[in-house]
Structures are given as structure tokens and as C-alpha cells.
Amino acid sequence: MKLKDRVAIVTGGSQGIGEAIAARYAAEGAKVAVVYHANDAVAKQSVDKIKSAGGTARAVKADCSKIPEIERMVAEVRDAFGGVHILVNNAGVFRTVPVSETTEAIWDEQLDLNLKGAFFCVKAVLPEFMKNGGGKVINVTSIAGVGAFPNCPAYCASKGGLEILTKALATELGRYKINVNSLAPGNVATPLNAHLRGPGNEAYLKLMQTMTPTGRDFMSVDEMTGAAVFLASEDSSGMHGATLLVDAGWSAW
């Protein structure tokens, strides 16, 4: 078990990539805080799955775009599990909106959660990491933060910002044995992009299939978990400010 006796916070942990990472971390021996925003029933279901498989997990409700809620969430996890060793900044929002229709509210919603929230989650866990003599931060970014796509300028800005924030944090925190790295998924089937996979999207899906050497449109959430475990374990002790692209080869082209 690569994460035995570690305590991990996974934001956006009740569904999609976050749910898969939380389950895999628990299977690797970690105590996992499944942080979610709104749906109590979905969060309970995710935690129950982990517990039924023999893992340890706790659902923690918080809006990770709000600093007071982030601070409360981290305190709750610390008090429940005795500390924090791993932070996965996975909570995020994605809107497909062209430049001409992007309002201040649409912009702020994505930047506040995807970028600002991630930073303040790191700040909130920092005292625990310093107490432990180290820690692991995994920022879940996107190929949209490494390249760019039309009709989602706020999302691209938020994920691109998170990529450079990862490097900035690594340069400052590496001396304290805190590893800060990013995991950049390609197209992964999650609730955030369900609207792109339904009826009427055949042309889009066909286009996606031409953009990877593997000929795939969407990957599964489970394909993200191996990289997430690696970045949370001692196997990645020499990595600081790096980006792991798990994108079915998209970035190779």
C-alpha cells in the first residue's frame, strides 16, 4: 500500500475524476476526506463505496471557492483524522461559452473555484504539512491549461493559471519537502462534460477521435488514478512543479 496511514483531502471528491482518485487512495491505505459542494446523497454514496471496500473515508461539505469554508474544511479533516498529508485540488467548474457571451459572473465562477480556491486550499493545509515535515499537492489541471480551445476562455485561463501556480508553489515550498505537481487530464468522461457526449454531438466526438493517436474521444476516470497515486506517494519525491499529462496522446500531436 503506497499511501498507508496518510490522510488525503480530495476536493470535488464525490464524483468524476475526484471520486475515482479518492477510491484509489483509500485502496492504497489512505484515510480520505471526500470534499463536496452540494449533493449530500452523492457524497454519501461515494464514501459508502469506499467503506464497503474496506477503506476509510469521510464526507466533508465545503464550497472551495470561499476561503472561510476552505479553512473550516481543513480543520474538520485535521480534527477527524489527526492531520493532513496529501491535497488533491480537483474541485472545478467548466462552462462552454464563447467570448462574446462570457459575463463577469461566468468568468468569476470558474476563476474563483478552479484557481483561487486551489491556492487557498494549499495555504490552508500548509501548517499541517510544515508540522509533518513535508506533504504532497496534486493540482488537477487540464490539457486546456497546457494548450487552448475555443469557446471556453475562462476555463482555459483558470487551468493555465493553475499550471503556472503549480510551478510557483513548487519553487517556494520544495525546500520544505512539499511536492507540488499537476495532473493534466485529456478528455475524460465526467459529469462536467456530459453535455458534450450526448445525442447531437456526433461530429464533435468524431473530431475528438482524430485528435489523439489512439483514436479515442473520452477516457475513463479510472485511467487518471495511477498518476494520482504516483504523485501522492514517495515514488515522486524528486518531482517539483512538473505536469503529468494523461491525455491519450493528445499533446503528442
Give the positions of each predicted feature.
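Catalytic Tyr-x(3-8)-Lys segment
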Residues: 201-223
